[in-house]
Amino acid sequence: MIKVENLTKVFHTDEVETHALNGVSLEVQDGEFVAVMGPSGCGKSTLLNILGLLDNPTSGHYSLDGHEVGGLRERERTLFRRGRIGFVFQSFNLIDELNVEENVELPLKALGVPAKERRQRVVEILRQLKMSHRAHHYPQQLSGGQQQRVAIARAVVTKPSLLLA
């Protein structure tokens, strides 16, 4: 599913060159669970941003589901990412103006899933995560743990092949 070879990421600012990733190689098969651990500033978020197609590597190869994706332009990355990759962000990234149900439904709308199917999927995932009773609440009305469950629901409602958290 994921194959990364000699991945590097270099950030340039004025006079400073920062090597966030240097020669990272890994392979993750379908169904495997992998934890990336390390101290602050070691490149974990940079790696996840590249794996999630939010950024490109400076060099190296990255293939996802057999497709070389490491050098895709932003629009191509967005189209490839939709429906294939689910994210649970550290800060949840819920939209304050949308209730729980609407937040979870959002990625399905972006994929063009018909309204009836969207409704069924949202109801089911909220039931599974024991959040049905909060469907019409807004993020600011939820505890941190409840917000995290909504973020998880939104990440998995599209049935992605890759989940990054």
Q: Predicted segments — roles?
A:
Residues M1-A165:
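ABC family nucleotide-binding domain
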